[in-house]
Amino acid sequence: ANHVATVYCNGRELGTHKGGFSTFRYDLTPAMKESGNVLTVTVTNGVSDIYPQNADFTFYGGLYRDVNFIEVKDAHFDLLLDGTDAVFVTPHNVGKTRVDLFPVNAEGCTLHVELKDAEGNCVGTADTDAAAHSHVLIDVKNPHLWNGMEDPYLYSAEASIVCDGEVLDQVTVRYGYRSFHVCPNTGFWLNGKNVPLHGVARHQDRLDKGWAISKADHEEDIALIKELGANTIRLAHYQHDQYFYDLCDETGFVLWAEI
C-alpha cells in the first residue's frame, strides 16, 4: 500500500502505516464480530514527509501487492513482528545453523524445528521450551551448498509450536548454505570461488499496470534477466515483493537488496 495507509475493521481504526514497500499487519480480532465484517483501507500517495522524498521514478498509489487474511490459534508465531514470519534461519558457518523463534501465547509449549533438504529428507532436529525469543542450534554435516546459477540448492526449516502433542502453528522458511565475501582487488567470491558479477537493475513496474504486477510478471522478469546472461540483480530502490526474492533464491541470482 503506497504510501500512507490507514486500516479499519467495522469502522474501528486499527492503525496507520507509513511507507509503501514493506509488509505490515494489524490484529483484527478486537474489532471483529460474528459475521458481516468489513475491512477498509484508505491509501494516499500525496506529498508527505515519508521516505523517499523524491526520486527518478514514479510513486504509484493504492493497494498494489497482496492483501492476506491470516487466521491462527492463540499460540502462534508473532505475526506482528515487523511483518516477518517470526522465524529466522542463519547459517553462521557452513552447516552450523541457528534458528531464532518468536512465539506469542505459547507458555508451556515446545518449539520443534526440523531441517530438510531439497528432497524433503530430515537432516537435523531440535526442541526448546517456548519463550518470547527462543533459539536452537543445529549442525548439518556436509551440507549441499547454494552455489548461485550453477546449483541454487535450498533447504527448509520447519518450525512448529507443539502443546500436548498438538501442532498449534507451523512456519516453513527456505534457506541455503553458502559463504561469500567481496575483495577490492578480485571482486565477488562465492563458496571460495571467484564469481564475476554481471547484472541489471530492476524496478517493480509494468506498462499499463504500474506497480500492481502479477506473479507471472515477476516470473517473466526472472526469465528475461536469465536469458540476458546476467547472474546478479540490483533491486532498485526499495523493498520488492517477497515472491521475487524467493524466485531469485530458487534461480540462483546474487541480489543487491536496497532497503
Each language-model region and where it sits:
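A short, structural micro-pattern
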Residues: 20, 60-63, 153, 169, ...
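Active-site-adjacent substrate/metal-binding segments within catalytic domains
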Residues: 1-9, 15-16, 70, 74-86, ...
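Outer-membrane beta-barrel proteins
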Residues: 55, 89-91, 143-147
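Ser/Thr- and Asn-enriched, surface-exposed coil loops between beta-strands
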Residues: 20, 93-97, 130-134
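Accessory beta-strand-rich segments of carbohydrate-active enzymes
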Residues: 1-80, 106, 118, 239-242, ...
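Surface beta-strand/loop "capping" patches
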Residues: 74-106
